[in-house]
A protein has these predicted regions:
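Short alpha-helical "packing" element that flanks the helix-turn-helix/winged-helix DNA-binding module
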Residues: 21-24, 375, 481
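Accessory DNA-binding and partner-docking regions appended to nucleic-acid-acting proteins
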Residues: 1-4, 340-341, 346-361, 367-373, ...
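Conserved catalytic helix of short-chain dehydrogenase/reductases
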Residues: 67
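Short alpha-helical segment immediately N-terminal to, or the first helix within
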Residues: 27, 304, 378, 483-484
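Helicase motor core with emphasis on the C-terminal RecA-like subdomain
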Residues: 2-11, 15-19, 23-45, 52-55, ...
């Protein structure tokens, strides 16, 4: 029988687990429930995907958004894993085919929205098959204290209880205060769970706050975006009107930008999201409807054009930068107008006819105001931004991180800020105590020859991805390509030693990359 380490290497291409991952995997395999709080980019999905491939039955992953399911399943299929998703983006015929195949044992991992668990057809399927594990992703959605409360998450427990044999349950989230963790544990009725918080820190992320009047924000944004060159980025706005205006502003300057918000036609949203994932668009301008669970690893910057409603939302959205561990920037533009806009939405939610009792809505509004207060403190503090956030999530941190605007740029003018920010990005890759030596190496500077090789590998990846009709990062991540440049493998055995290269991907793409490397650097013999 395979063990977790062999699955990790053969399927996902990693030599070792990251901190906290192996303990979670082994607890789930032993049948113990898990509650794990891990920052975006820390590898939550590995924690349930590895045991899913080792457990005898099917794993059901409850996920809140179609985009997350599509990303995760696409990446799994590229790695050779039998996975599928079931949601309303499929036609009725596609849903029926997927369920029939699931009954026939085609899949080891199935992603569903929480509402799907209540549907008779899916319930009948789950009664017939062995469900070994139920994974609750974005588990903070179960809590009214959480920033993304979804009432349908409260019914996950009923589904678990209805199964003939109770599966092991794993709950995962990137951001959860102590109160939210209490709600997750209680509402899912986890059985003596193994609880772990691997730490919220993302050392490769640089944080910055800038106060800017609404009239100043367009210029600030353009300056920031133009300095990023061709890097992929996300710009978050608080309203759909602001999204449309900001996307048009960037487009008017020749920047490949697209908009994403709930008022757009579903087909337009899908096209714009795919354009971003497939690198046809450089920048996505979006409300927070975009990105929960988006797994695009090479987002190099996230700019919040408006202050978010709370630190949970901010850290989750900012955390979509640098998921591959390479240096990336998270910048917040804020003004007093932002606070008034958020309060308007809080009041609107209070007035909404959503069937909730008045006292429940009043309590939700009070909690929202409390979270907004901390968000405002973060935006205006002169102390270390990283420490402020980590302390908010209950984690100790040094007085100064050395990689945020408050630490690095106090009393400096804007030009000095940008110069030192560039230097800080380089230091983050080389010196971060959380990044391994290997990951630090692939984030460093390259020689002119290596830059040409990297460009050739990017071009090859783009061609191969187009043939497979998948986003380029699903072939190999930027970090994996940079390690290829550093290591210059010339044999399949050497290629399989590259982080992120599993057996299926090596079989599918290995010879093409080996030929490209040999063409550029020649034989070492």
């Amino acid at each position: 029988m395979a063990d977790p380490h062999s699955i990790l290497k053969k399927v996902f291409g990693y030599d070792s687990f990251r901190p906290g991952q192996e303990d979670i995997v082994r607890r789930l395999l032993a049948g113990q429930d898990v509650l794990a709080v891990m920052p975006t980019g820390a590898g939550k999905s590995i924690c349930y995907q590895v045991p899913a491939l080792l457990l005898p039955g099917i794993t059901i992953v409850v996920s809140p958004l179609v985009s997350l399911m599509k990303d995760q399943v696409g990446a799994l299929v590229q790695a050779g894993v039998a996975a599928a998703f079931l949601n309303n983006s499929l036609t009725d015929n596609q849903k029926a085919l997927m369920l029939r195949r699931a009954r026939e044992g085609w899949y080891k991992i199935i992603y569903v929205a929480p509402e799907r668990l209540e549907m008779p057809g899916f319930q009948h399927f789950a009664q017939e098959k062995l469900i070994s594990m139920v994974t609750v992703d974005e588990a903070h959605c179960i809590s009214q204290w959480g920033q993304d409360f979804r009432p349908s998450y409260l019914r996950i427990k009923e589904f678990v209880d209805s199964l003939p044999n109770r599966p092991v349950v794993g709950a995962f989230t990137a951001t959860a205060t102590a109160r939210v963790r209490d709600d997750i544990r209680s509402h899912l009725e986890l059985h003596q769970p193994y609880e772990v918080t691997t730490g919220f820190d993302r050392p490769n992320l640089y944080f910055e706050t800038r106060r800017a009047l609404p009239s100043q924000k367009p210029k600030e944004l353009l300056d920031l975006v133009l300095r990023e060159g061709d890097n992929a980025g996300i710009v978050y706005c608080s309203t759909t009107k602001q999204v449309d205006e900001t996307a048009r502003l960037l487009q008017s300057r020749g920047i490949r930008a697209a908009a994403y918000h709930a008022k757009l036609d579903a087909e337009v949203r899908r096209k714009n999201q795919d354009d971003f994932l497939y690198d046809r668009v450089q920048i996505m301008v979006a409300t927070n409807a975009f990105g929960m669970g988006i797994d695009k690893p090479n987002v190099r910057f996230v700019i919040h054009y408006n202050m978010p409603k709370d630190l949970e939302s901010y850290y989750q959205e900012a955390g979509r930068a640098g998921r591959d561990g390479l240096p990336s920037r998270c910048i917040l533009l804020y003004s007093g107008t932002d606070v008034r806009t958020i309060r308007f939405f809080i009041d609107k939610e209070m007035e909404a006819d959503n069937g909730l009792p008045a006292d429940v809505k009043a309590e939700a509004a009070r909690k929202a105001e409390e979270r907004l207060r901390y968000m405002t403190f973060y935006s205006t503090t002169q102390k270390c931004l990283r420490r402020f956030m980590l302390n908010y999530f209950g984690e100790a941190a040094p007085e100064k991180c050395g990689n945020c605007s408050c630490c690095l740029f106090a009393e400096q003018n804007a030009q000095e800020v940008e110069q030192r920010a560039a230097a800080a990005k380089q230091r983050a890759a080389a010196n971060s105590r959380r990044l391994s030596a290997r990951r630090a190496a692939v984030g460093g500077d390259l020689s002119e020859v290596d830059e040409k090789l990297l460009a050739a590998l990017y071009a090859l990846r783009k061609r191969l991805a187009a043939k497979q009709n998948v986003p380029a990062y699903m072939v190999f991540s930027d970090a994996t390509l940079r390690e290829m440049v550093q290591s210059k493998p010339l044999s399949m055995d050497e290629f399989l030693n590259i982080t992120g290269v599993g057996e299926k991907k090596a079989a599918r793409y290995g010879m093409a990359f080996l030929r490209a490397i040999e063409d550029m650097v020649g034989s070492r013999e």
